[in-house]
Swiss-Prot record:
HAMAP family: LeuD_type1
Gene Ontology terms, MF aspect: 3-isopropylmalate dehydratase activity
Name the record gives this protein: 3-isopropylmalate dehydratase small subunit
Record has Transcription regulation as a keyword: no
GO biological process, one term: L-leucine biosynthetic process
Biological function: Catalyzes the isomerization between 2-isopropylmalate and 3-isopropylmalate, via the formation of 2-isopropylmaleate.
Native species: Paracoccus denitrificans (strain Pd 1222)
CDD domains: IPMI_Swivel (cd01577)
Enzyme Commission designation: 4.2.1.33
SUPFAM superfamilies membership: LeuD/IlvD-like
Source organism superkingdom: Bacteria
Gene3D superfamilies, per the entry: Aconitase, domain 4
Listed pathway(s): Amino-acid biosynthesis; L-leucine biosynthesis; L-leucine from 3-methyl-2-oxobutanoate: step 2/4
Keyword Ligase: no
Amino acid sequence: MDKFTTLTGIAAPMPLVNIDTDMIIPKQFLKTIHRSGLGKNLFDEMRYNPDGSEIPDFVLNQPAYRESQIIVAGDNFGCGSSREHAPWALLDFGIRCVISTSFADIFYNNCFKNGILPIVMPQEVVDVLMEDAKKGANARMTVDLENLTVTTSDGQSFPFELDPFRRHCLLNGLDDIGLTMEKAGAIDTYEAQMAQSRPWV
């Protein structure tokens, strides 16, 4: 998993509330077990017409936001059914951070396991960030995980809170496997001791 320290990039404004996981990645794309390749189907039914042509008004189809790395979203982002494909699709598109007033719990937890930083901020702050994101590609937002701040293109800085353990994992690029591998030495020692003391196990 890639480390997340400081991210400066284009932020896409998505003020719609209750964006659920089926909107993020529709059910017909859940057959794969591969994390790569889902980015093209991110927000599929919002991005494309039935004939496969792009819907010009959708934010990620607009030239200014095609390279977005941050989403500033409406309340309750990631609600709906549990599917890890949702953060997979976001990450494969290039999204590393989503900012909202609230997230569905399962989606929130899945983000951390896949290298995406979900940030919860008060409505008044999200409103400011949403307006900054509407400035387009020339307005770059900065998310500083080390200092726990989000800074707008005009220099306004807002603090956010995050569980220290989750912050540690993102800063060091540690998913569940990475955390286990940190203990590889201790695991090997334990197994060697068990082989000596309980060879029948």
